[in-house]
UniProtKB/Swiss-Prot annotation:
Alphabetical UniProt keywords: ATP-binding, Cytoplasm, DNA replication, DNA-binding, Lipid-binding, Nucleotide-binding
Record-given protein name: Chromosomal replication initiator protein DnaA
NCBIfam families reported for this sequence: DnaA (TIGR00362)
Annotated region described as Domain IV, binds dsDNA, given as residue ranges: 352-472
Amino acid sequence: MSNMEQDRWSRVKGRLRSSVGEDVYSSWFARMDLESVHDESVHLSVPTRFLKSWIQTHYSDKVLSCWQAELPEVNRVDLTVRSPVRCAAPAKEAPAPVESRRDEQRPSAERSNGATPVSANHDALGGSPLDPRLTFASFVVGRSNTLAHAAAKQVAEGRRGDPVMFNPLYIHSGVGLGKTHLLQAVTWAGNAGTERKVLYLTAEKFMYGFVAALKTQTSLAFKEALRGIDVLVIDDLQFLQGKTTQAEFCHTLNALIDAGRQVVVAADRPPADLESLDERVRSRLAGGLVVEMAPLGEDLRLGILRSRVVAARTHHASFDVPQPVLEYLARTITHNGRDLEGAINRLLAHSKLNNQPVTLEMAEHEVRDLIRPSEPKRIKIEDIQRIVARQYNVSRSDLLSSRRTANVVRPRQVAMYLAKTLTLRSLPEIGRRFGGRDHTTVLHAVRKIEGLVSKDTTLSDEVESLKRQLQE
């Protein structure tokens, strides 16, 4: 891809991100690549059929309009599925780019030597491809991911017959913070010996496998194969759809846990927030060890950048990024690890294709679209309940209870009001999180507090104080 096409593609992605929002973009478009632009058509690719189908069904017009804003003559956007190349084992001599997903785009200079490497992963059982770069050796540990890394390492080092400590192990975080890296590291390490069978599946792969088994009347064999696994690793659980598929996943989860087998799951939110999942599944997932991977701190971002430079030198020995440039990138690119990976890839491509050393001026120009304004803090209902309970000297269990004494009712109403105004949760979801109340109770509480804060200055000050505490 030429520099002009790269710039054009960056502008189109920027329009698309602005149009659909960061969450939607990260979920559906982050792994979409530009293959070519020819006359009036654009050729894009994604790594899975599921992504292709979803984007074509829900966003094809939006993608086309973003391209037409850049190139008015474009009248067609073709979307295809990239075919990964399989290989046998992780490349031990090459440290992986940390925090990157398995389908991360690589610079054109690297792609010329082959597609992103992936590995066979119990193909007979329909395992998802593995990236040999995503191992424990290449994972950079920092304060935000220490617990998740330690728990994953403990799971990976277990032996058949050992007591299972964390079951299921549930890891959640925003996109690009290293969940997939840890899950694939568990799979690589677990399969390094011959003692245990470890299977890595994305949620969409689980869905496709189960639906295909139903169509071919081989569902019994599918179930037996899954339940014969020692460690089942499921990624991107938020994409698990369909009542029948969710029921089968729940049965598999129960069967494995009851048999003392290990289950490891990752998603982009905690179990309680997976509103599309059956309550039984959420409850079982919440019963294990739930670990959040927090956003990357500056020190960890710097470590990731250094690791990526070391990895790039495996194929480009002369590649170097000066320390001031690394510090600039770590300070300004704060969103996730994929953006850090992309920044190093851009500098590598620009340096090699133009035969120029990396400078701070070059970096400022090449990564300008990766520097995003600070995003508001994501506030959780649990945080609201905790801070409101502390403010009014009641317990969180009081807020969730059926008690109707005055010293509990008002704090509960304030907490519901804050949940409605500071989060994107629906009224039924807020009610469920407050002891199973219905949406009319929440609506009454919201209207009650809205009416009071306009008249009662003491209450108004209390509510503003709570908002400040939650947003700090």
